[in-house]
Every structure is written in C-alpha cells, then in structure tokens.
C-alpha cells in the first residue's frame, strides 16, 4: 500500500542532516545508515550511502533514477545460495 500523499515522503531526520551537511561542505564520503525505510530525495544524488542488510553495510551509489524509491529496495536481505546440486550418489550404502 502506498503512503498517503497528504503525509509526504519519509526520510530519517539524522540521515537528512548528514546529507545536507555534506552538500554544504562538498564532501563525498560514505554515509552509514540503518534506515532502509527512508525515501531517496533529490539531494541524495551523487552520494554513496552504506545501507545495513542485517549483517553488514552495503554501499549504494545514488543516481537520479533512484529518487522516490526506498533505500532498502537496493540492498537484498537474503542470500540466495542456489538449489541443491545433483551429486553422484555412491552405490555402496
């Protein structure tokens, strides 16, 4: 279900402060965040944000196409290890 238009997009306040401070200073270092639910704003474009996947922080470089999406959409939380392989079974049991 989409968020109500009257509420507007959500972004974590601390993340917004960090991005605004970096835009003012011109710094382009990696921003570490746990806020996967934050919406990507146009001011985030060009920054690298390390988003937590439950185990580690995965760096995500934000482009213009990502604006309006959530940070968590670009970092998978589950690791796919493949289906079981057909191993040759020995004849002796």
Curated annotation (Swiss-Prot):
Segments forming a coiled coil: none
UniProt GO cellular component terms: cytoplasm; small ribosomal subunit
InterPro entries assigned: Ribosomal_uS19 (IPR002222), Ribosomal_uS19_bac-type (IPR005732), Ribosomal_uS19_CS (IPR020934), Ribosomal_uS19_SF (IPR023575)
GO process terms (BP): ribosomal small subunit assembly; translation
Molecular function terms, GO-annotated: rRNA binding; structural constituent of ribosome
Pfam families per record: Ribosomal_S19
Gene3D superfamilies given in the database record: 30s Ribosomal Protein S19, Chain A (3.30.860.10)
SUPFAM superfamilies named in the record: Ribosomal protein S19 (SSF54570)
Keywords of this entry: Ribonucleoprotein, Ribosomal protein, RNA-binding, rRNA-binding
Keyword check for RNA-binding: yes
Keyword Protease: no
Family per record: Belongs to the universal ribosomal protein uS19 family.
HAMAP family per record: Ribosomal_uS19 (MF_00531)
Job description of the protein: Protein S19 forms a complex with S13 that binds strongly to the 16S ribosomal RNA.
Identification of the protein by name: Small ribosomal subunit protein uS19
